[in-house]
Amino acid sequence: RRVSWRYFADVLAIEIDDIPEEKRSAISAALRFKAPFFWKIPIIRSVLPLMNSSKPLCLLFASAFFFTAVCNGEEKIHDIVIYGDSSGAAVAAISAKRDGRSVIWLNPTSFPGGMSSSGLGATDFLGRRNTFGGIASEFYDAIAAAYGEKYVRSFEPKVGLQVFKKMIAVAGVEVVYNELLDRTPGKGVKMNGKKIESITMLSGKTYRAKMFIDASYVGDLMAAAGVTYTVGREPENQYNEDMAGVRRGDTKPRLHYTQKDKDHFIKQVDPYITPGKPESGLLPKIYKIENLTNGQGDKKIQAYNYRVCLTTDPNLHIPIVKPEGYNELDHELLLRNFEAGDLRMPALIEPLSGTGSKVDWNNMHAVGSDLAGGNWDYPEASYEKRREIEKAHETYIRGFLWTLSSNPRVPEAIRKQASKYGLSKDEFTDNGGWPWMIYIREARRMVSDYVMTQHDCEGKRSAPDPVGLGSFGMDSHCVQHFVTESGHAQNEGVIWRVPPKPYGISYRSIIPKKGECENLFSPICFSASHVAHGSMRMEPVFMTLSESAVIAAGLAMDKNTSVQDVDYEALKKKLLDAKQILQNQPLAQ
């Protein structure tokens, strides 16, 4: 027979009115898992007569059973389960808790805040601080306050971590760290029709909710739920984007790139192991591709790196040493580029707020800290393979830093400058000063009913249902080093063009298309082309879209609708109440 709270009352001889209304669905949920087995236990069957004759004993026994189910995690149905490692995941959890929702945050990492706590100290929003509000604005205000300032753009990783920890604690967010989704097909996500009913982790724990938010940088939950997504670059003709697909660095004028020769080779560099001898093979991570033409699509993504926090403070300085597994051949392209006459420091060194000794060391110019081509498998890779890719990046970047500071083939001025820097003892203290997280600039991208494209970024199309703003340049780091027809190394995939003004990001770009999963949001791996994603992939945007997702989830629950059927006008009102910014505003004087 159907197990329900009425069945619970009938078997235990409890008057239905004695069961509070708010407890009935919870009891029903617990029994749905426990009842068939529970009533077959001999000791339980033997005490039933006593229970029928004693209502207090009955209620006591029922309560014990009920709380056993709760403690086993089999009864609890949260309003919202958030899965993710990003700054957006933290903001979503805070937002849900403030909204009075029962929420649990399942964090695949051991720390909160994503890249905003793991080295991305130089926040990319082009000074357009007026393009986001809500909890994202609170976070950056708290960062500034930590330095005794009204406004800062860059900050130390440890300060980002401290601010997120405090905001999470004040909100009372329940976080489970190091909780990884079981990605075994058919095991990690249990669907009930078009809704996720529960998700199961590698720990064996299962979590149930009415709404789920995938706030991960890679979109594992979104993919496991059967939502349409893509990886790589669309061809130019798919969305009629003149920056899409392959973009050769030797194409001039570079209409897809407005920063002259930055991030490109400016000298002729031989790509072969033995210079001038193609038969010797290519240097590591250089590719010879026949008929490589601008506008072609592929499955490749822009390069990753670690955003290392370096310092010149002798009291904090951890020396850069030659890493285990170092191979000079991995850095031969860098060395030959110097020897060919490119004397630019191959790094974007951005000072961080604080004592003035720390910097956010990022990739720049022809060969830098990006390991182009080393990450193409990352989005779909197993957890084990991802760890291998991360380790390869760490070895490469440690080797790159050591080469800059120690190799005599590096120009003296650059070697002297690089040798001043070391990792910082007071950052990532449990990891030797090395960032916890690799910088995942791009992974999976959902394909929904509204795909954000270059046309949205450039104001040629405007989403009628904005839930946040984007403003950063359409930006892709190098995708690959390739051999030109003349036999020299060049970069491919680098794009940059700044939108004329901030633009709206569609609500439909953070939810699956109609007909797919009805209780899932994807505010990090959102629906966007490679070109548009390059502009939208900024930490303040991730935070903004994640808060908007939570607010929309609340509406969907309150109205008992799918995420696709949320009324936008009602959502817009709630977003504005939460101080989200939905349209371009003049800068404050």
Show the residue positions of the predicted features.
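Conserved beta-strand-loop-beta-strand element in the redox core of flavoprotein oxidoreductases
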Residues: 187-206
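Boundary at the C-terminal end of the N-terminal hydrophobic targeting segment
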Residues: 71-75
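Beta1/beta-strand and adjacent pyrophosphate-binding region of the FAD-binding site
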Residues: 76-86
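Bacterial N-terminal signal peptides
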Residues: 58-68
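Flavin (FAD/FMN)-binding glycine-rich loop and adjacent Rossmann-like elements that form
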Residues: 205-211, 215-589
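Conserved N-terminal/central alpha/beta ligand/cofactor-binding core
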Residues: 95-102, 107-190, 230, 238-240
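Bacterial N-terminal signal peptides that target proteins for export
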Residues: 45-59
